[in-house]
């Protein structure tokens, strides 16, 4: 459940209730449940340590919203952009990462989320296990070294990957192995916040 605090009154919105809301409405409601918001400057990275011991490394232009403390049955945060999560284990309080087009549910694990573009998002699992739920109500369970592609609010693909290629941005590198020119320019555009167009001659 997502806890919303408005004028000192606690409201509980269940998953079923949220399922009937639009993507924009869900995002607006969830924004009210977080005390803190950070937006990483262009070209920089930021490390956040949450009160439960969870570590978040956020990439350039990423927005992260989180509470000062976790009071409910679940630990919930919101992310828009790209972030790596090292979640502190707590079997009684699952950790939920919300975005505009999917949700990741974990107990304790390490994974990378990339949703700069909500029409084409990725989740890469480094360690542990997670369950994804999309705005289309698709559910996908992941194992380590798997990547899930999400398109237009639904599940598109799951495959094995080298997770280092998707987390090396934390060391200031970008892996472009096997990517098309269009994919490369899109990633650089997201990172720097500018429009980069490929040369037709390439």
What are the residue ranges of the model-derived segments?
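A residue-level detector for the "anchor" residue at the start of short, highly conserved motifs
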Residues: 3-202
């Amino acid at each position: 459940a997502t806890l919303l605090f408005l004028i000192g009154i606690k409201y509980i919105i269940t998953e079923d209730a949220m399922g009937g809301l639009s993507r924009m409405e869900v995002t607006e409601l969830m924004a009210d449940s977080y005390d803190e918001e950070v937006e990483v400057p262009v070209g920089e990275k930021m490390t956040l340590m949450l009160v439960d011991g969870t570590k978040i490394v956020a990439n350039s232009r990423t927005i992260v919203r989180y509470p000062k403390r976790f009071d409910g049955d679940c630990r919930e945060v919101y992310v828009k952009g790209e972030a790596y999560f090292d979640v502190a284990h707590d079997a009684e309080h699952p950790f939920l990462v919300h975005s505009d087009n999917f949700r990741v549910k974990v107990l304790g694990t390490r994974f990378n989320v990339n949703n700069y573009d909500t029409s084409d998002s990725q989740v890469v699992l480094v360690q542990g296990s997670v369950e994804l739920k999309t705005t289309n109500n698709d559910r996908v369970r992941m194992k380590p070294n798997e990547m899930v592609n999400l398109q237009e609010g639904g599940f598109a693909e799951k495959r094995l990957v080298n997770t280092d290629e998707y987390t090396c941005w934390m060391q200031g590198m970008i892996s472009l192995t096997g990517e098309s020119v269009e994919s490369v320019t899109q990633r650089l555009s997201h990172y720097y916040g500018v429009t980069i167009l490929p040369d037709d001659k390439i």
